[in-house]
Amino acid sequence: VMPPVRSKEDVSFVWNTIKQNQIDTVGTDHVANQLKLKLDGNTVWDALAGFPSIGVSLALLLSEGVNKNRITISQLTNLTSLNAAKIFGMYPAKGSLEPNSDADITLVDLKKEHKATSELFGGFSDYTVYQDWKLKGWPVKTIVRGEIVSEDFQVVGKQGYGKLVPRKTMST
């Protein structure tokens, strides 16, 4: 992550800034690499940037944010959906549950506890920097355009169900 957020003071500053609605979105530096590829090189400057994190990003925000009263569930929704949809010109098709929107929704269980592992999400990556973190609050079901596409860490949607979402151009 560039820049890294390491100190307790930095972490506290980020959460307080989010709580005050001064940060619009939270993203990941997700790069689905295997550890041997990431570390392939002689110096830190040779290492590949980023790390696999998209699979735990929502659980981290639920566990460390909502469940520790650093942010509200409404703020989380804005950070992860509404604001991004508006910024990227996809609102109201995305980021909204209003009539004529796609009404995509992720159901979460704020009490579900699970350890983060690379095996949890399958795929190419064989590591996570959050290995064995016990997180409380996980997504349990994702619905896209009325169809369940993910349930209990498993993709259950039909291949090819994705759809291009046209963006509105921004006027300058």
What are these regions (language model features)?
Residues 1-9, 48-53, 129-134:
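A short acidic, glycine-rich active-site loop
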Residues 19-26, 31-110:
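His/Asp/Glu-enriched, well-ordered alpha-helical/loop segment
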Residues 1-26:
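Histidine/acidic residue-rich metal-binding segments in metalloenzymes
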